[in-house]
Amino acid sequence: YNGHLNMAYYNVLFDRAVDEVYELIGIGADYLKRAKHSTFTAEVHVRYVRELHANDPVRVTFQLLDFDSKRFHYFEQLFHATEGWVSATSENMTLHVDMAAKKVASFPDSVMRSLARMKAAHAQLPRPEAAGRRIAMPGR
């Protein structure tokens, strides 16, 4: 309503973009079925920078900031696809989970190699200015 994109749908767009990345690094839908492992989001920080309206074209970028054997930290930006401005950002910490045991588990070697290649490529990009921000009331 109000002619703009509701805040929940920003997260849907970010999540759909991550699904594409998961396929690239080998932890997509087939991986869940085959390996019985998945990912759970442990923390997310979304910033709503500029309003999108219904039917605005969008594009999402993904930047891997860091990873270890059981988790990865990434930053996404949602852009108006034709005008180029940033509408929202999303910073996430994601855990790799053994679905049978329901506990955090190590990535397989193939995924670790994919993450290492991606991090090396993304390390060439500038770190997003908004990465690592926190919510707080300014001191008075």
Segments predicted by a language model, with ranges:
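Short beta-strand segments
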Residues: 2, 6, 58-60, 94
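Hot-dog-fold acyl-thioester-processing enzymes
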Residues: 1-41, 98-140
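A generic structural signal for solvent-exposed, polar alpha-helical segments
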Residues: 15-16, 28, 46, 54, ...
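Hydrophobic beta-strand-centered segment that forms part of the acyl-chain substrate-binding groove
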Residues: 21-72, 87
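Mid-chain, well-packed structural core segment of small domains
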Residues: 65-95
